[in-house]
Amino acid sequence: MILEACISTIEGLKAAQKFSLDRVEICKDLHLEGLTPSIEIQSLARSLFNGTRYVMIRPHNNGFQYNQMEIKKMKKSIEAAKKNGVHGVVFGVLKKHKIDFKKNEELINVAKDLNLKCTFHKAFDQCQNFEKSLIELSEIGFD
C-alpha cells in the first residue's frame, strides 16, 4: 500500500519526510480542494522530501471545466513541475459530468513527453458513471 498525503506547506513536507511517507501530492489552498502550487514550494519539496512527488495541476476552483487558455496555462505548469524534479502530475478535465477526452489527452501528451506519470484527481467524484469513467481514464493514458 502506498502512503500518500496532500501537502501545501513546508511543515507538511517535513512531516511527510519524518514519517517516511511514500508519496506527496503538492498543492496549495487545500480548503479549495487543491490548486497548482507555487514554483517555490515545488523546488523546496525536492530537497525536503525524498519520496515520490506529484504536483496538482488545477488553475482555479471553479469546477473542472477549463477553456483553451487555461489548458495552455496547465501545460506550462506541467513543464514547470518537471523542471522541479517531480515524478508525476495530478489533474482532471470534465465536460459537464463526463471526461473531456480531448483536453485530458492534450495534458497527458505533454506530461508523458516529459516522462511524468498522470493521475486523474478529484474531478472523478463528479463523473456520472464511475465504472465507465474508470475504464475510459485507463484507455486515454492515466496511470
Give each language-model segment a name.
Residues M1-L32:
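N-terminal entry module detector
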Residues M1-T9, I57-K75, T119-N129:
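Active-site mouth loops of central-metabolism enzymes
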Residues K75-V90:
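Active-site gating/metal-coordination segments in enzymes
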Residues L3-A5, V24-I26, R53-I57, V89-F91, ...:
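Hydrophobic faces of well-ordered beta-strands that scaffold small-molecule active sites
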